Regions:
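A structural signal for short hydrophobic beta-strand segments in well-ordered beta-sheet cores
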Residues: 25, 144-147, 198, 209
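Conserved beta-strand termini and adjacent loop/short-helix elements that scaffold enzyme active sites
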Residues: 77-79, 132, 210-212
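Short, well-ordered beta-strand micro-motif
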Residues: 27, 133, 146, 176-178, ...
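Conserved N-terminal catalytic core of the sugar/cofactor nucleotidyltransferase
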Residues: 2-5, 13, 19, 27-106, ...
Length: 244
């Protein structure tokens, strides 16, 4: 299976650490963050990771000149200008010739999600897309995703006020998508998957949420980036860091 890994952002919330370095190339314990992300994909049968690159693509290409990471083939898709999340997904997937269902992962999220179970759920429900959802205490910082009893997404509410959130289950940044989703995304300009693409698919009843209370950390801020270091040192995933 192939995966698009979103790594093109500027990492502004991690400055000054990211002034000259993409956040996915910052160290997490003993290796760059991207190696944890791609290593997790490898553990679940992904054989190609398509990196959607924007800021400082040279840092990635110089670090992995043979285009392999954690035993996974890397394909580089370098944006000429920022395309936002949906635009980046379309650009990377079409550049690599993706024509079967594929994964999308946020490159700054560390998780022990069972990706095989997510894919099985997606295949069983027959939608166009399936999102990994996790519960959080404060959903106001995230995309909130209420679902019905069958897992069908009822709405996609991006960063609502805490007292107005329809659920505490949020978008955890790992998706299974059918290639037809790419046709929904404008071929040029900035398009947000959270604010435009997913709400449109949900409105047609074709988007599902897979609820799983996994380990999960969005490393995009200084506190959460540091927390990831402590978590891996403490082996909160239940395994030694080398086997994450």
């Amino acid at each position: 299976m192939r995966a698009v890994v979103l790594v093109g952002g500027f990492g502004t919330r991690l400055r000054p650490l990211t002034l000259g370095t993409p956040k996915q190339m910052l160290p997490v314990v003993d290796r760059p963050m991207i190696e944890w992300v791609v290593g997790h994909l490898a553990d679940h049968g992904v054989d190609e990771a398509i990196l959607s690159l924007g800021f400082r693509p040279d840092v990635f290409t110089e670090a992995y000149p043979d285009q392999t990471c954690a035993g996974v083939k890397l394909t580089y898709a370098v944006e000429d200008e920022p395309l936002d999340t949906a635009g980046a997904i379309r650009f990377a997937a079409t550049s690599a010739g993706v024509d079967e269902r594929f994964l999308v992962v946020n490159g700054d999220v560390l998780t022990d999600l069972d990706i095989g179970a997510l894919v099985d759920f997606h295949d069983a429900h027959g939608g166009e897309g399936t999102l990994h959802l996790i519960p959080v205490e404060d959903p106001s910082r995230y995309g909130v995703v209420p679902t019905d009893d069958g897992g069908r997404v009822q709405a996609f509410v991006e960063k609502p006020p805490a007292d107005e959130a329809p659920s505490n289950w949020i978008n955890a940044g790992t998706y299974v998508l059918e290639p037809s989703v790419l046709e929904r995304i404008a071929p040029e300009g900035r398009v947000s998957v959270e604010r435009e693409t997913f709400p449109a698919i949900a409105a047609e009843g074709r988007l599902y949420g897979y609820e799983a209370e996994t380990y999960w950390v969005d490393t995009g801020t200084i506190p959460t980036y540091l927390q990831a270091q402590f978590d891996l040192v403490d082996c909160v995933l239940g395994t030694a860091p080398a086997s994450f």
